[in-house]
UniProtKB/Swiss-Prot annotation:
Residues 69-82 have a biased composition (Basic and acidic residues). Keywords: Amidation, Cleavage on pair of basic residues, Disulfide bond, Hormone, Neuropeptide, Secreted, Signal. This is Pro-MCH. GO terms for cellular component: extracellular space; nucleus; synapse. The keyword Signal applies. Its main location: secreted. One of its GO terms (molecular function) is type 1 melanin-concentrating hormone receptor binding. It is found in: Secreted. Induction: Inhibited by neurogenic stress or osmotic stress. The gene is Pmch.
C-alpha cells in the first residue's frame, strides 16, 4: 500500500512539473519597469513642484513613451507587447498576473520631494542629532557615517548583523 501511494505521489509530481513546462510565459524587461518607475516619479515631482502655478495651461510632454537606449532616446511603441520566452517557466512566479502595475514606493509631498530647498532645516536637525548623540559612539564615527551604516544594516545590504554597526 505504501508503495502505491509513493508511486502516485511521484506520478502527480511528474505531471505537475511537465504541465508547467509546456505553458508559455510573457515577460517585460526589468529595465523597462525601472524606467517606468523613474518617469512616473519624475512626473509626480514636477506636478507637486508646480501645483501652486495653476494658471499655466501648457502641459509638458510625457516622457513615458521613451526609453534610454544605446542609440539615444527613441520611441518605444513596439515594446508595449509582451515577449514570448518559450517554455522557460519560473515556478516561484507561476500564477502571478502578467501585467503587474508597478507603483512608486511613496508619493512624496512638499519639501521631501526637493530637499535642496530646505538645506537650512537639514543643518539644524543635524546639529540637534550631534547634541543628543551618545558620547561613547560619537568618538568612534562621525554622526553621518554612523547613521549611514545603520540604514545600510536596516536595508539588508551588508553582510553583518545590525548589532555590529
Amino acid at each position: 500500500m505504501a508503495k502505491m501511494s509513493l508511486s502516485s505521489y511521484m506520478l502527480m509530481l511528474a505531471f505537475s512539473l511537465f504541465s508547467h513546462g509546456i505553458l508559455l510565459s510573457a515577460s517585460k524587461s526589468i529595465r523597462n519597469v525601472e524606467d517606468d518607475i523613474v518617469f512616473n516619479t519624475f512626473r509626480m515631482g514636477k506636478a507637486f513642484q508646480k501645483e501652486d502655478t495653476a494658471e499655466r495651461s501648457v502641459v509638458a510632454p510625457s516622457l513615458e513613451g521613451y526609453k534610454n537606449d544605446e542609440s539615444g532616446f527613441m520611441k518605444d511603441d513596439d515594446d508595449k507587447t509582451t515577449k514570448n520566452t518559450g517554455s522557460k517557466q519560473n515556478l516561484v512566479t507561476h500564477g502571478l498576473p502578467l501585467s503587474l502595475a508597478v507603483k512608486p514606493y511613496l508619493a512624496l509631498k512638499g519639501p521631501a520631494v526637493f530637499p535642496a530647498e530646505n538645506g537650512v532645516q537639514n543643518t539644524e536637525s543635524t546639529q540637534e542629532k550631534r547634541e543628543i548623540g551618545d558620547e561613547e559612539n560619537s568618538a568612534k564615527f562621525p554622526i553621518g557615517r554612523r547613521d549611514f551604516d545603520m540604514l545600510r544594516c536596516m536595508l539588508g545590504r551588508v553582510y553583518r548583523p545590525c548589532w555590529q554597526v
